């Protein structure tokens, strides 16, 4: 069919619209139906409109000056399968296309709507290049970006002749140019080159702006063509340069902006990178340049249209490509780094439009507020993604274009074509922002929910929640064992163990059920109760154990457990009431402050009492473990009180802290849980130590083990290394309890006819170690009295021989002294009747150990009075002078007292002077005690026989203290 010289592509588009059907994309941004808009060209500023259209298949070029050409349109049947891209760069050699020259603000960005090259055409399409295979008609996807009733819709396909290797024809000087290209995504069955006829073109301004109309459908089938409605163009015909390689098409598209005036899509041809060699086009890969412009454009131009051709249109090379003498195809950018963003002057934006430099998806829904959502652009080293595609690395986070007040941003990137189309990208409003490693505690921080907290804290979150929940079961189990095994123990210890059990169970249930309200399983009030209740329970347990172990150091009013029983319920009730019924955060914070102050006071008091006990008591580790455990528990309670107050700031509403994550929140709660866990363990151990029975001083089993491990050497008695007389009891101790006389060497009573002395019996030896009162209370064998002091102990060791008998046998012979020096029988015989007499008690002997009647008669028969020896000789007058006054009447008492008080000093030796009897002794060498003896005077007999004995006993008691002085005996 021969085309009319005046036809343009606008009628062709209008004819295609009814066939394609009106979709939801047609009515978007249209103030009235599309058929009401009439394509027209309005001249302005007295400029001539010249349209030069290239002829298809050896036809002459069309001129836009004929007004009749508008009514006619090309009757070429269009392929019903229209798509946004061609099946590959298969451009035939042709002429160099027109240049579009204009300086403006542009943004070249690779949008997510372009599906790129769909790969090389299949074998069936290559075998049938002449006629397209019929396919069932499907409703194509039609995307129409903004238009107005006066908008002008036309299509222009600009092609450039590809350059042969080594060719230098068709070079143009470098200049600022703008390209509007159409990227067709359908493989055209006819492959014939364009024939361009050169002629100069003039600027064709236009009054209204136009937008890009994209006709196509989704899928991998053959697709139609894509036409772009273009703005102000400055065209220039270039000479035909045959070339071997072909360049991929470039898609021109403008972003929709509701409410703004229609603007022109203008593309500035950017120079290619220098130094890149030209390479032949690849069938299965290509580079796609998509250009989007922002804001309304101040200029309007006419459109150059061309009839669709079976081959894609080549792109005119830029001025930088021709500067080195030959043309470079755009396909040489395959695999090259993207061009860095460039800013271009002159871009304008309509007031009130959002400043987004990345174009929106044509098929994506607008946001609720009408603003455009920024879409992530693929990086140069990042391949396109689609559902089901295996990924070797995690996807990169979305890159959002910064909002700036600058006029425009040009971003040029290259894209490797893949065999699969891109899926529609979700809008940025549905993407949850992932916080950085240190997110601020504000509205942008993630909420306190399980998912965001798990993403931020990774495995630390689950380790904290489940670890603390399980570890709190340990003090609960220990407290349960304490309560069950020691029901008969102290009540305060059992109460403390029960409180630790309840507090540990509540904390474990809170962490395993709904930690910090992150899973919303519990209500707000129930969560507050479970969070705050363990603190007063543990604090009450600490106070109970302190009162039990260290209550003696407290004042008397504070030692009553009833006071603790009143304060503890009031503390817990106030916290529960404010958490359940209070609606004022100030009241809740005030209650928490008072609770923490009370906890700090109890902990400090415990520490002070422990310090006093440890300083005053024994310092051994095993002496008193109670104060040390309580000191550890008090320190942990003091720290927990401070952190509990800090954590309460996140429990109630606050500026910028309600339900938001922050690293301060995480640090406070992490350390508070650890302190509570250690505190509960210390209290459980202290309660267990208080309820267990006290071990004996020496455990029987332990003693057996020590004897087996360290046996004593043979032949060594296990007598303790201490004085053996220190076992003597106090003054009231009898012979039954501590009788050590069995281990002493003693003479038998009455041996060799000797008299029985008080020290020779069993009690005599025991009494010499510990003196007791006559008739004193006797203790039982198993009873233990208080230890005697050093002043009461007689540290003299017990004598292995009977010294009294030895001294009497050595000194006092029959011819010297007929009686013992240590007995009073001879002296009593002088002052009393022969029937009455008593023995003088030895120092340290038992006072009531007196001789009975038989013993007295026996001793009296054998004893001779010392006065008998003295009276046989002549004594001086002063010696024989009787006492005066009352002394004569009480001769017996005064003489005995003076004899007892006097010091017995025996200093003479009869055999030293060669004397054989006392008669030969001089008077000056007689014993000094003889001078104290009064002359014998008659004494009336006592009324009763037992009276002298009692009188002598009383005298012995009175003279006991005076006889404590040592007697000197010089041999």
UniProtKB/Swiss-Prot annotation:
Coiled coil: none annotated. The modification Omega-N-methylarginine is found at residue 771. Residues 239-252, 427-445 have a biased composition (Low complexity). Residues 60-94, 114-137, 236-256, 272-445, 753-799, 832-855, 927-971 are annotated as: Disordered. Residues 28-467, 513-532, 582-588, 650-669 are extracellular. Residues 290-300, 363-372, 401-417, 951-971 have a biased composition (Polar residues). The modification Phosphoserine is found at residues 768, 780, 783, 789, 799, 806, 845, 865, 894-895, 903. The chain crosses the membrane at residues 468-488, 492-512, 533-553, 561-581, 589-609, 629-649, 670-690. Its main location: membrane. Residues 489-491, 554-560, 610-628, 691-971 are cytoplasmic. Keywords: Glycoprotein, Membrane, Methylation, Phosphoprotein, Signal, Transmembrane, Transmembrane helix. It comes from the Eukaryota. Residues 1-27 form the signal peptide. It is a multi-pass membrane protein. One of its GO terms (cellular component) is membrane. Glycans are attached at residues 58, 369. This is Proline-rich transmembrane protein 3. It comes from Mus musculus.
